Structures are given as C-alpha cells and as structure tokens.
A protein has these predicted regions:
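Bacterial Sec-dependent N-terminal signal peptides
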Residues: 4, 16-41
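Alpha-helical transmembrane segments
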Residues: 11-15
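Sec-dependent signal peptide recognition
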Residues: 2-10
C-alpha cells in the first residue's frame, strides 16, 4: 500500500516512542516470565480471534482482458512492459502456480525460464491465492479499495467480485478495506461507494461479520501528511455513518494514534475512539526483532491497555519485512512479532501484506533463490541471507503464527516453521 512515510518522521517516531532505532539493541523480554494477556472486548468472530491479510489485488497486464489493460502496479509506466528501467516492484513473484502469465522485458530467469508476471484480473490467479490462504490457515482477507473513480475504478470494481467468488469457493472470509489516501471528496465518495456498490457484498456467506455486523475498515484517518487532509469531525462523521448502517468499523490508524504525535495529527483521539477496532500501521516503523521488542514494551502493551479500557478491539499489524532491505532474517523477524502481539493480548492480527511486491513486504509466493529471479535484475530472493527458503515459506510461517495466536499451539519465542518443508 502507499503507506511508507517520510523517513525522518518515522525515525523520530521510533526514537521518541520506543527508545530504539536500527542502531539500538533492545533486550528480548524473557519468554518464561511474561504473562499473556487475555483481554477481550468482543466475542470471537471473523476478525476477533482471527488473522487477516491485507490483499491488494492490484496487478494487471496488457492483454489480460482487464478494463485497465496496462501493467498496473508492475511498472512506473503502465503502458510499457516491466523491465529493469521500468519497474514498480521490490520483490520478484514465484509464478509457477499460475496458468496465465504475461511477458516482460527482463532477461530470462537464471534457470532459463522466461521472466513473466501474473495478473490479479485472472480468475485463476485470485482463486489460487485464496487457496494458499485456506491451505495455510489464514482466516480472511481485507480487500484494499482505493479511490474507485477514474481510470482504476472499473478494474477495482471487478476485483471485488473476483475476491467474493474466490473467498466463497475456498472458505476464506473477506471484507472491504478502504484506503482514503488522496481522496478529495472523501465523505461523500465513501458513502456513495458503500451504498451503491460495496454494501451488496455483505450478503455473501464469505463476507466477514463481527458481533453480527458486516466488517468494513477505513485506512488513513488522522495521518499527519498532505495525503490525508481530513478533519477529525469529518472522519468521525464517516465512522458514525457506517455504524448507523449496521457495520463493525475498523480503523487503520497512525502508529502513534494514542499519543497524537509523530505520524498522527493532534486532536484526533476522540475520532480514533469511535472505531470498533483499531489497527495501527507498522510498515516502516520496525525492521528487526529488537525493534519489535522495543515497540512491544513501549507502544503495543500500552495500546492494548488503552483499547481495553475504552471498549475497543485491538488488531496490530505484523509484517514479514522488506525483502530487498534484508529485514526478514529468514522468518525470525516476523515470528518475533507474532510472539510479541500474542503476549500483548491483541484481539486480532493484521498481516501487511499478502501481495505487496511493490514494497517487498509480501507473504505470497516469492522467488526462493536466484534461479527464479531475472538474470542481472538485482532482485533478492528469499535465500538472501544464506538460508534456503521455499517460495511458500512466509505463507507457512503465517499459518503457524495464526495457530499460536488462536491457541492451537503453545506460545513460543522460537520459530517452529522450517524454511524448507
């Protein structure tokens, strides 16, 4: 998602609120002396007690039959094929499970196979990706919905229908997650889009319900940047409007929402408190296990306590790490977050993201070694630190993290998932 903010802002946020940075080592809290909180606001449902992945579904290609008919999100210049000088991604996908792929201007993979990419518009692509979710114990997907007007509107509408079909076929829940970044008439557009288009999906047996209500998430209220210029009053109006329509409303909010500083606008706490569930953003905030520990001690525990004290469910983010930035530590970084958020007492977990090849934070199948990367492309593979990992490793790791979160396996600071099955 388009959610990485100014580096100086992020650095300041980590330093002031966590007492740590990439150069500061925070001791790991002892696993055997920490009590796991069991706070609950809402009973188990389709988001409480569950692990949800953020699902972009925003890749297309020329010739895929999509309304956009461009290399949507694969490239900077969508009208041209992906190439080393025209790319929009940081990680290379593993495409072996897809029946239809599309050409690029990259050299062949190092194994000699053509370097091709998938299209999210293909029914088989969406189906196989939701099959991966089901096979790996992922409970649901939050379909990202950016401003559905203009050039991207028709393909985004089509993706909602495709996600519904795939979710129903594979027994995976889904819900709509609006990203309001850059919306200029946000209040009216959200209400119109929900009323005229998206609310119809709530009749699907696969549409997520919590407390008997259809789930909708709004990402972007309160962020302190020029892409989210909304007043607290306007945002509160939208939250209350969705709730008046019978929805359970999740807020994708700034990391420092509770203190109303750094990435959060001031005077927004009353708006944040109106959400039924809060999911603070974490991409760009931590890059290793030590920093996850720092956030657990200095931010997550206090966030959970505040939510509990105010009748709000808490759904923190977990990320695999930017592969190209060498953050993953063959899964140890992500596992530490599962461990810490379980100890924090979170009511739900949000994985950011499923298919975020653009920022290198995807858990979907990825090139496992240089054999599956275009020759001369400089993309790192999952084995970048010398540990061999299967293409589906982060799907399997997420599945084990979900089992631990749901109490199906004991809590442990030691990653149980083997990089190679």
């Amino acid at each position: 998602m388009r959610k990485i903010f100014n580096v100086l802002l992020i650095t300041a946020a980590i330093a002031t609120s966590c007492g740590c940075s990439k150069k500061t080592v925070v001791p790991t809290p002892p696993a055997d002396t920490t009590t796991v909180k069991t706070h609950t606001q809402s009973p188990p449902g389709d988001v409480v007690g569950k692990v949800i992945v953020g699902y972009q579904g925003w890749f297309a290609a020329i010739g895929d039959g999509s309304p956009i008919n461009r290399y949507w999100h694969w490239t900077q210049i969508w009208e041209q094929e992906p190439s080393p000088t025209n790319t929009g991604i940081r990680s290379w996908p593993d495409v072996r499970d897809y029946t239809a792929t599309f050409p690029t201007q990259y050299s062949n993979l190092n194994n000699g196979q053509p370097a091709t990419v998938f299209s999210s518009f293909s029914d088989q692509t969406v189906d196989v990706q939701f099959k991966w979710m089901k096979q790996n114990g992922i409970d649901g997907a939050a379909l990202q919905r950016f401003n559905p007007s203009g050039l991207e509107g028709p393909v985004r509408d089509a993706m909602a229908a495709k996600v519904k079909t795939a979710a129903e076929a594979n027994g995976v829940k889904f819900y709509i997650m609006y990203d309001v970044s850059g919306w200029t008439t946000m209040q009216a557009d959200l209400k119109t889009d929900w009323t005229s288009k998206m609310s119809a999906y709530t009749t699907s047996p696969a549409y997520a319900k919590q407390n008997g209500k259809p789930v909708v998430c709004i990402w972007g209220f309160g962020f302190n940047d020029d892409n989210h210029n909304f007043s607290a009053a306007d945002c509160l109006d939208v939250i209350k409007w969705f709730q008046s329509k019978g929805c359970y409303v999740i807020g994708g909010v700034p990391t420092h929402w509770r203190d109303e500083n750094s990435d959060s606008r001031p005077d927004f706490l009353g708006t944040y408190k109106a959400f039924n569930m809060l999911s603070p953003w974490m991409v760009g905030r931590i890059a290793n296990a030590n920093e996850s520990d720092g956030f657990f001690v200095n931010v997550n525990k206090a966030d959970e306590a505040y939510c509990y004290g105010n009748g709000i469910d808490y759904q923190p983010c977990i990320l695999p790490g930017d592969l190209q930035g060498r953050q993953r530590a063959h899964g140890d970084f992500m596992w530490r977050q599962f461990y810490n958020m379980k100890r924090a007492g979170a009511q739900g977990l949000y994985i950011s993201m499923f298919d975020e090849y653009n920022e290198g934070n995807q858990i979907a199948k990825t090139a496992e070694s240089q054999a599956f990367v275009p020759a001369g492309s400089n993309f790192l593979a999952l084995d970048e630190d010398g540990t061999a990992c299967s293409a589906d490793y982060y799907l399997r790791l997420t599945g084990d993290g979900a089992k631990m979160f749901r109490g199906e396996i004991p809590i442990t600071a030691t990653r149980p998932t083997k990089p190679m099955p």
